Amino acid sequence: MQGTSSNGHRLVLFDIDGTLLSAGRVARDAILRSLKTSYGWSYTPDHEDRGKFDFSGKTDPQIVRELVVEEVGAERFEAGLPRALEIYLEELERQLLPGTVVPKPGIETLLERLAADPRVTLALLTGNLERGARLKLEPPGFNRYFPFGAFGSDSADRYQLPPIAVERALAHSGKRFEGKSVVIVGDSVHDVACGRSLGVRSVAVATGITSPERLAAEGPDALFDSFADTDRAFDAIVE
């Protein structure tokens, strides 16, 4: 599919956890239950000490691999992964009770403004499995802003996801987005590094676990402590 030039339009790719919302420890607890059931793997403080619970910017399959592969081996990891992810999604759905999902400051107003702008195509760029992403976005009603995206269920490699999102944007809108017409919005160093490696723009926000100083060191095109100032955030995204 050839598509037309984006001509001043923007494809804005949003991360979920730490950027759009927080679901507390729900996803972590769901992962732990899943790994206990599917691999017999149990959490110990040593895993925390070795940094294995830094999930920021990673895909769900990558998270499972990093947690268990050293202890269960590559063959058992691969064999058990489909069931582990299935159990994770079941646990996630069970634990996402009312009040567990909290939108980040300013994000609802920002999404409304972006969605109303005819220059903007919104999509997701997330390490979440697609079903997991939709489960998290349902409580605040954010699914309506994101008709498509690229997910951890498309590839375990985060850096392979933006081209998938661009191709889906072409199918959805008929526009071919490239270079600086693509904007990655996220809260992790991986979001910024991903944007830089692909030659697209990145807008970082320090509403996740990564400090503003750490994000700034990666050289995003714009950096915010939060999106509470929606006018500034909007301008930075669509410039």
Predicted segments with their positions:
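Histidine/lysine/aspartate-rich catalytic loop segments that bind and position anionic ligands
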Residues: E138-A169
